[in-house]
Amino acid sequence: MAQNITLSQFRQNNGVVIDTRNSALYNGWPDALHGTSGHVSGARNLAASWLDEMTDAQFDAWSALRPLSAETRIALYGEPEDNAAVEAWLRQKELHAPWRISDAFSCDCPLERLPGFHQLVPACWLNALIAHRQVNEKPVGKWTVIEAGWGMRDTFRQGHIPGADYLDTGELESEPLWNVVAPEALRNVLAAHGIRCDTTVILYSRTPLAAARVAHILLYAGVEDVRVLDGGWRAWLCAGFPVASGDALPIKSACDFGAPLPAQPQLMLSLPQARALLNRKDASMVSVRSWAEFSGATSGYDYIDACGEIPGARWGRGGRGKDGVEDFLNPDATLRCADYVTAMWEAWNITADQHIAFYCGTGWRASLAFICARAMGWTNIGVYDGGWYEWSLHHNNG
């Protein structure tokens, strides 16, 4: 039988508080127009909606932040049915969570939230915006929804979010290194998609990487309000929202960008700029790659011959293979909470007070880490666009 307890009473003894709501509510999205925003200070997020998909490995990674045992006092808060589901699931792990925080949102304790929670939008918010309903954190002016992908136009035609445009990453990258195109070419691409600096752009993709890559490039260009659908296309489908088919509707081109381009050049580092960070104690070159890539066992790419790592780089984690970013994702493919990512990076002495340059092979995984850090409120961050691919071609870097 669940036992109600106030937050102050529960905290008189060491224990763990778990928020069983979805990550959007935990991060700070109100559950109603102008409603309460955030989560109990120090609470951990274990959403009931994850349980059917959460593997043992994912739970081990989740619990590594603060290991739990059969003796750990655990209290839950959220919807009653979610609390019951999480309690039953934890019981299978021989963990006991009989307490319920009765005053999670009515006590005097301040709530915490992700500083940039509005940058990661939930599917329900986007659906309401498209339907012209009132929403929290509404875009100030013109907004557009864009699906990002590489060679995915036919897939887009088969099904996409109603009203969405399609932007292929091939329009934004140039061979041979797949770095961002020159400023004038970038200006032309954005104009063709009707994007000005004051356009709110809401991005999604079939996997997390394409949306993150385009989001970073748009921010570098100077688009002021760039948001990403947290959980991507999968989140939209799982919510059962409408799906359109066919080509994107015609887009009215923008006459001008409305600002110098790039307006945020510091977000995209060149090879000399990346090299200059290596000898600075207040900076980190952060490799967002698999351990096999970071340790030099493989390059990760069939078109990159050299194996190894930038000397002095720190491992920012990634996942399995060149497209893997599991270390940053919840079981439902939403981004992990700030406490988890912060602890993951602190283990490699990667902290918010440093000048951070994320990189990977060619910029995609690094962009996801950038989007994550940006939402966490980290400010002195950028992406070394050339990554290991460019670095490995310059032997004098060694």
Positions of PLM-derived features:
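Cytosolic catalytic domains that perform sulfur/thiol-centered chemistry
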Residues: 1-398
